Amino acid sequence: MMPTRAEAEKILEEAEQCNSGPWVNHSRITAKCAEKIAKLCENLDSEKAYILGLLHDIGRKFGVRHLGHVYDGYTYMMSLGYDEVAKICLTHSFNNSTVKEYIGKFDVSDEELELIETALAKVNMDDYDKLIQLCDALAGSDGVLNIEDRMRDVKQRYGYYPQEKWNSNIRLKNYFEKKTGNNIYKIVNQS
């Protein structure tokens, strides 16, 4: 189950009142990128892609947390009955379905980490998961970035970027370029 576009916009606006910051605009940019790419993919619904992109970081509503925002977003969306969004809140940080590749602080309790790992192990990644992972890697807070520049920025901020995650982001870009028959940057109007 998922919220409508209007409901998703309202959820994000309410979240911004609780914890404003660059993550809100990043979420909007992620959503716009996802919508544009999905329009060119036969098996994806652009409205659904927009909603999933808009709410992928909704766990940030509850404060400044790193891995904790994955837990917070997942449990928040599950509590509202939005299981499809909850799945994206969970998968957007784990291209290769492993918590080991998380970039940032492991600021979760043992119980929260166990829930993340257990839920992640049950997930079958689909093209929506892959699309939001790609768009998350393209979206800055001020606009669309070259994916390699964005990964370098993250590496500079956190001191590392796992090579396998780097490689998987490039594979995602290539996957959607092949699927759409277009250059990703042209699709999302990256200048």
Per-region residue spans from a language model:
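Conserved N-terminal diphosphate/IPP-binding helix and adjacent helical/loop segment
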Residues: 1-5, 27
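Generic N-terminal amphipathic, Lys/Arg-enriched alpha-helix
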Residues: 5-19
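Active-site helical microenvironments for divalent-metal-assisted chemistry
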Residues: 7, 42, 101, 157, ...
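Divalent metal-dependent catalytic cores for phosphoryl transfer on phosphate-bearing substrates
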Residues: 13, 40-154
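A short, charge-rich alpha-helical start-of-domain segment used by transcription regulators
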Residues: 22-24
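Charged phosphate-binding loop/patch that engages nucleotide di/tri-phosphates or the phosphate backbone
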Residues: 160-191
